[in-house]
């Protein structure tokens, strides 16, 4: 067995952990962006419906 490789295992684990953390944070950021965009779209639709119902009442 190559013992030189085993010396680098902690470094490789730190790199793997960092990559995983970056991917998780990126995924969470994308989900937050999508949710905010969807909420803005829903608010816009509600405002349009409110305007249309006010027009019908008048």
UniProtKB/Swiss-Prot annotation:
Write the record's keywords in alphabetical order, separated by commas. Answer: Coiled coil, Membrane, Transmembrane, Transmembrane helix
Q: Which residues cross the membrane?
A: 10-32
Organism field: Homo sapiens (Human)
**What InterPro entries does the annotation carry?**
SMIM11
Q: Could you say which tissues express the protein in this record?
A: Expressed in heart, spleen, liver, stomach, muscle, lung, testis, skin, PBL and bone marrow.
- Quick one: a GO cellular component term? membrane
PANTHER family tied to this protein: SMALL INTEGRAL MEMBRANE PROTEIN 11, SMALL INTEGRAL MEMBRANE PROTEIN 11A
Q: Where can this protein be found?
A: Membrane
**Which coarse location class describes where this protein primarily resides?**
membrane
**Ranges in coiled-coil conformation:** 29-58
Please report the record's description of how this protein sits within the membrane.
Single-pass membrane protein
> What protein name applies here?
Small integral membrane protein 11
Read off the Pfam families from this record: FAM165
């Amino acid at each position: 067995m190559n013992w030189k490789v085993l010396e680098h295992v902690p470094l490789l684990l730190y790199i793997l952990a960092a990559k995983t953390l970056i991917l998780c944070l990126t995924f969470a950021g994308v989900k937050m962006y999508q949710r905010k965009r969807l909420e803005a779209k829903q608010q816009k639709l509600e405002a349009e419906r409110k305007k249309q119902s006010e027009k019908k009442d008048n």
